[in-house]
């Protein structure tokens, strides 16, 4: 499914070159996870998607136990998700990061390490109760995602002619 935000993801990857993480914020069920996973499949050699709604405690605990030992953090993530990570060619996605704010605050150290790119997704991530007691990383670039507009809806229906007629 084609979305306008996809081009912004490509631009972020080109411009950031690993110097910032991307936080995609938007309402529930607008396709954040879908578009990020499509972007990962098309633009990286490998990716890991950590869905914090479903991630077991052992994955969440890694961010407390190994933040000062990133080699082991990446080793555990790679083995748990059975995905080989390639330096500067892999993306790690923190899906629904508001559920586990500790992972969001870890972005500062992960980006500084420079091995991989990071995208965080979430709804309501800027609500005070979801950012309480964490340091919001300055290494985050924000992108707002909205529901499909009419043109995107027509793309999804494979109806490109109607938009031309309207314009």
Language model features with spans:
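Phosphate-binding site recognition
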Residues: 1-167
